[in-house]
Structures are given as structure tokens and as C-alpha cells.
Amino acid sequence: MSSIDPATFAAQFAQIEIQPFKQRYQLQTNTYQSQLSALGKVESAMREFRTALNEMNSSTNSIIKNSTSISQEGYFTANADAKALSGSYQIFVEQVATSHQVSTGMPADLDATTEIPKTGNLEFTINGKTMTIDLSTVDTDGDGVTTVSDLTKAINNNSDNPGVNATLVRSNGQTHFMLSSTETGVANQINVSATGTGQAWFEDAFTNLSQISAPQDAVIWLGAEKTGLKLTNSSNTFEGVIDGVDITVTKAQTSGETAIGLGIGADDEATKEQLNKFVDAYNTLISTIDEHTQIGSEDKKRGVLASDPTMRSIESQLSSLVRGEHGGMRLSEIGVTLDRHGKLKVDQEKFAEAQKNNSAGLEAMFNGDGALLDSMDAMAEPFLKFSSGAFKSRKEALQANLDRLSDKQTTLERKYDMSYKRYLKQFTQMNTLMTQMNQTMSMFG
């Protein structure tokens, strides 16, 4: 009668006891991990889709694109948004807006270390806003000396600064204390006075200002000079002078010159590109969802999220929005429809016709509050909230399941250890008994 290996037998018998549970727990773990991974991929795809929506639905960007053409470059630029209507205009640039720049009447031997009074106030008023510099607070480094350099920092860094920059400029061997308004236009003229310092040279310096650049507004004529509509603006950018069009002037024309032509029209290619971006973003999201929710067939594996209610809700809401009415129109009316796979396809000829005949209607359908892109963004938000979104809740639930399975597997390992020790003891005893029997039998051999 041959002996046995107690350790091998103990391991085999202990493994048999836990094997059904081990296989079940591992299968469940694999399922939950696959679902967790799939949810992460869908969530990522949905965030990318939402980013694309926001990029096409902002104050500076939309689905519908218009373009501008200018007959003579160098005097102004123009930007037309989706609301702009096609048309031709004449623009004459009389003057550009400039900011106010002055040089103070500081002494000729001024430099950055020149000391200034430690008492009194320096007051600035620009466009109705006032800033008062208390000269006793200008010495921020605490060295007991207040310098012109300290004053420039105090002016520029003051939280109440109404729009003025102070700089020290060196020219022809002399340092000048300069003040410049940060905004253009007559309204942004710099008014400054120094009082209570007890030092006339300092107060006179802010009374005797040398003007380097006068503040002026931008002036254009919508039409010919002197006979068209005169428009004045403190900034060089005239926003919405023509509905949906911003004009930025860069150089003044000479009086008597001919007005410059401005043309506004639909940018068919840019609009087509934007529409295709929207369609591609939508279809990419649907493809990602479909990859993980497919029912399964002979040649396709069932998706790990095939019965997931969150996925069904997303697809249902997206489909409803695509088929719904927005701004009095439906996507199907302009050649954008769903195919049998739930993805968007575009009839380019039908869309081009809609763009030609009703660009304003297209803009109202796609962009703006409550329009299609805004509605899709609002639909996605509850799913993607970092604190309480549906994806977060689903992933937390799956992770909780994985944690419970991990605890069960730990318990199973303890059970294996206990069974192994029990079987090892039993098989060791059996092996000892078999050895004794063999020895007894050999005595009669």
C-alpha cells in the first residue's frame, strides 16, 4: 500500500469546496468591471459630444456661418455672425479711437529713485470713476523712502484703478513719468490732481501735464462721408451697427475719399463644415453607445450594457430631440434625418436649399436658448454632473458591487485556508496509518 502526499490531496479537496463560489465571484467581477469600463467610455464620449455642442453654440460660434468681403483692405475689418443678413454697404472711416496719454511735469533729473512726498493724496478720475492714492501708504517695502518707482506700482496695482497706467519712460537721456488711459475714447480722459503734500513741485507736476496723445472716439459713416449715417464709438469696435455685424476700424481715411464697400453673405462651405461637425459628434456618441449596448447575434457579442436603463434613457432622449421641433422647424425639413441605425445623415442638396431660402430659420433652430444644441446640452447635463450625475451614481453602484465581491473573495480565501488545514491534518493522519499498516504487513511478508 503506497503512501500519499497529504499537502497535494489537501489542496485539491479544499479547492473543490470553494471552486463553484470562486468561479461565480470571478464571473460577476468580470461583468461589473466590464460594465464600469464601458460606462466610463460612454461618459467620455458624451462629454466630448457636449464640448462639441458648446463650441458650436456660443456668442462667437454657431452652425450657420456668414462671411464678409471688403473692397479695400487696411481701414477696417468686419465679422458677421449667423444673424447677419446678406447685403452690401458703404463704410467711410473718419477717425479711429485713441487713448489719452500725458507726461507729468516732473523735474528734469527725475529717475526711478527720486523721492516723493510721504503725505497727501493723488486723485485720478476717469469716466466717472475715482481712485485716491494715499501717499503715506506708497512705501510698501518699509524702507522709509517713498520713490517714483513706488508710486507707479501703487497706481497700477490699486484695486480701485479706474483705467490708468503709470510708467517711467527714458528718452534722450531723461526719465519721464507717463500716464496712459487703458481704454480709448473721449470719455476716458485722464484727470489727476495732487493735494496736501506740502511740496509744490510735486503738485505742480500733476497740474502741468504735457499731452502726448489726445483721447478721441472712433467715427465712421454708414454711407458716404458727410451724407451717410454718422456713428461714434469710444472703442474702435462698433458692435451690431449692422444687425449681426461687428466692425473694427484700424486706420482713418482721408477726407474726400470714396467710402469702402462691405459685403455680407452666407458662407456655404463653412456652414456645411459646421453641420458635419455636429453630425459627426452625434454619430460618434451613438456609435459608442451602440458598441456597448448591442443585443448580440451569431457574429456579435452581446454588449455589457445591453439592458442598462441609463443607456436607454440617453438614446431615447437624443432621438426625441432630433425628431422634435426647434424654432418652428424640424431637422427632417432641412435634409437631416436618422437612418435605421439611429445615426444622422444629411441630404446636402436639401440642406443647401434651406440655407439659401431660410438661413435665419436655420439659426433659430440650431442656436440660442432653447434651440436644438442648447436642448441637447441641457439633456446631457444631469447625466454628467460630477457630484450627482447619473454616470457617477451608476459607477458608484458598480464599484460597491465590486467591493462586496472583493470581501466575499477574501472570505473565500479564509475558508480555503481552513479547509486546507483540516484536510492536511486528516490526510497526514491517514498517511501515518498507512505507513504503520505497511510496516505491520512487512512483518508477515
From Swiss-Prot:
Subcellular compartments: Secreted; Bacterial flagellum
GO biological process, any: bacterial-type flagellum-dependent cell motility
Coiled-coil annotated residue ranges, if any: 388-423
Pfam families membership: Flagellin_IN, FliD_C, FliD_N
Keywords: Bacterial flagellum, Coiled coil, Secreted
Record flagged with keyword Cytoplasm: no
GO cellular component, one term: bacterial-type flagellum filament cap
InterPro entries: Flagellin_hook_IN_motif, FliD, FliD_C, FliD_N
Note in the entry: V.parahaemolyticus possesses two flagellar systems: a single polar flagellum propels the bacterium in liquid (swimming), while multiple lateral (peritrichous) flagella move the bacterium over surfaces (swarming). The polar flagellum is synthesized constitutively but lateral flagella are produced only under conditions in which the polar flagellum is not functional.
Subunit composition and interactions: Homopentamer.
Membership in a protein family: Belongs to the FliD family.
Role according to the record: Required for the morphogenesis and for the elongation of the flagellar filament by facilitating polymerization of the flagellin monomers at the tip of growing filament. Forms a capping structure, which prevents flagellin subunits (transported through the central channel of the flagellum) from leaking out without polymerization at the distal end. Essential for swarming motility.
Name of the protein: Lateral flagellar hook-associated protein 2
Organism: Vibrio parahaemolyticus serotype O3:K6 (strain RIMD 2210633)
Lineage: Bacteria, Pseudomonadati, Pseudomonadota, Gammaproteobacteria, Vibrionales
